[in-house]
């Protein structure tokens, strides 16, 4: 049996169900819409690049075919269109953040091959970050570039404690992550 683990706008991930961990024990061929696209021996495999809002059939020898449809997207833009350089030296933080801020719901931000040096990026709901093969987000080594999020703050109207972040279930101060999302959903990376 083939299980669909994920189907985005331009990629999909599948699990080959069997009695072994990680590897299937033998190589198998994967066909996408009848065309052989890969050979693998891993229980989990991904297919990309795919086209948004398109019907596909995946076949693996000895298993029932699986039909799925990729999701639609509002637009797909390159981070380089916002001035990101991707050379590992230039600070691309503002360029990446501007691109994220400009994405509409359902938008996809594409990172071509390169190394994008950055401080934390604030994400938002209903977007996709799509990194090409050999595209790297290189986090700054300067800890002062990572804001500290207090574990709790006080609501100025009600006086109640508001949790702003937790570490292993505890509301304690912590540095913001390289990719950060608060009160957000449906973010695909």
What are these regions (language model features)?
Residues 1-189:
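Extracellular/periplasmic carbohydrate-active domains that bind, remodel
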